[in-house]
Amino acid sequence: EATDSRRGDGVYGKATHAMNLLRERKLLYGISSCYTRANFESITSEEYYDSLIRMGAYFIWYFHYMPVGNDASPELLPTPEQRTEVYRRIRRYRAEKPLFAMDFQNDAEFVGGCIAGGRTYLHINANGDVDPCVFIHYSDSNIREKTLLETMKSPLFMAYHDGQPFNDNMLRPC
């Protein structure tokens, strides 16, 4: 219900069907989950985590909601207390369960801060536009027109490269 309300009717069913097919074929896969102020309890719960293990997932990427764009909802940004709780839960699950979790923002201390702009991460959208980050919907390159190396040398990606690290607080959201 929560997935369909965000992504559209039937999306959750399609996603779980795909996960079942991957599990049946013994293929390695993981999922990405976005937690908000409204859904953080359910999406980081032990019940949710265990359901992913039963469905055969090997890893999960957690992203906390970032209000981006004209239709953004800043009130959905998780509170500092919620982020702290997610931080604790993920570390406990890592120690106890056979599903590896990564927390895009809360694990910044392990990767030296922001990994965007091609430092070790970039985002390619459905149109082929190469964005510095999934949260930054701006691109000066398209994968159909440039190689990844050309993209990494573009003015936008070089500006990211030259500006990193962006701050000393590894847990500060962008």
PLM-predicted stretches and their roles:
Residues A2-G117, A126-N127, D131, F135-I143:
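Radical SAM enzyme [4Fe-4S]-AdoMet core and its adjacent flexible, acidic
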Residues F135-C174:
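Flexible mid-to-C-terminal extensions adjoining Fe-S/redox cofactors in radical SAM and related proteins
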